[in-house]
Amino acid sequence: MTKIYFIAGETSGDFIGGRIIQHLKDNIEIKCMGVGGKYMEEAGSFKSLFSITSINLMGFVEILPHIFKLKKLIDKTVEDITNSRADLLITIDSPGFTYRVAKRVRKLLPKLKMIHIVAPSVWAYKEDRAVKYAQIYDCLFALLPFEPPYFTRLGLDCRYIGHPIMEQEFYSDKVALRKEFKIDENERVLCVTLGSRKGEILRHLPVFVSSIEEIFKSCNNLKVIFTLANPAHEAIIKPFLEDVKFNYLFSSERLKTYAVADAALAKSGTNTLEIAASGTPMIVAYKVNLISFFIIRLLIKIKYVTLINIIAGSEIIPEFIQFNCRASLISNKLQELLFNSKKAYEQVIESQKILQKLGFESNRSPSYIAAEIIKQEFLKPKIKLLKEKD
């Protein structure tokens, strides 16, 4: 039986991995193992080597307290791969962890085929990473159509597969969703996304809650829905809401939440693409540790953090980053989107134009495309060889 070792370090990567495993198992027999979350464990029928929350970290300074734990997990993963006798290693995003593992595995198992899914954003910062990936991996799958040339010119086989949100089912019946969420006819709905990392949630909650309280002063028919990347996050958020006057609820059904909302307050990330694809206007707010921020500013070579703005070359979606991540600024702009239908409509239309450029309205299935490449070019030769030996 063909063995594939997977590594994903966060929820978005776990989702991609789970979908790819489902397609791989359609017509070939494989054994999956490695590091992943609920999607990969369910699809691959395996138990993750450890919880992905252990490596779901971001930022330069934020990682420092966990550096020795991360090193141990890298050691543990490398050892597990070498003992697994896997035929293929597939790493998904989380470059801080997956690249370090792959680099060491390459030295120990030089003949092992290795694929990385989600090309590093070398067009944004640290372009030298393209060279490093070309030295380690056999193939790279890119989510954005303009990314492959950054790697193919270095001799690395890089394929554009499309973004995973292309194969998600978005909701459009707002009337039905309002009934499902028990939202009154006169209520305005604000969706709030805080991220999947505990550190992100704790860092953004105070300013997000203050922003909402400012809005509530002039809008007492406001209902707030906090989207949960993990049901356990409700316990982290609740202490910050003990004295608030606005109505709120929690939801783990993020796509429904995005669609039912009149506007969204979002932290930077993949969620912004999902919100835009749901046809909901938003503002993006984000901050990191101060030292991490200055390091990032030295490395980064783009003006915006939201992918839609980056592609557009202009601020379609208002961004409030670091020192501008303040309740007074955020609340003013959110009120514009909640009560100025023209402003909200303009943002939605411009965002849709960018999504079309990225192919988000095509019939592509990134996970199916990835699975077919893996089967035809990386597994079929191995499967054929095994059959000949039998």
Curated annotation (Swiss-Prot):
EC number: 2.4.1.182
Pathway assignment: Bacterial outer membrane biogenesis; LPS lipid A biosynthesis
GO BP terms: lipid A biosynthetic process
Catalytic reactions on record: a lipid X + a UDP-2-N,3-O-bis[(3R)-3-hydroxyacyl]-alpha-D-glucosamine = a lipid A disaccharide + UDP + H(+)
One term of GO molecular function: lipid-A-disaccharide synthase activity
UniProt KW keywords: Glycosyltransferase, Lipid A biosynthesis, Lipid biosynthesis, Lipid metabolism, Transferase
Pfam families: LpxB
Statement: the UniProt record of this protein carries the keyword Transferase: yes
Any GO CC annotation of this UniProt entry: membrane
Family: Belongs to the LpxB family.
Function, as annotated: Condensation of UDP-2,3-diacylglucosamine and 2,3-diacylglucosamine-1-phosphate to form lipid A disaccharide, a precursor of lipid A, a phosphorylated glycolipid that anchors the lipopolysaccharide to the outer membrane of the cell.
Alphabetized NCBIfam families for the sequence: lpxB
Name under which the protein is recorded: Lipid-A-disaccharide synthase
Organism: Rickettsia felis (strain ATCC VR-1525 / URRWXCal2)
Gene of this entry: lpxB
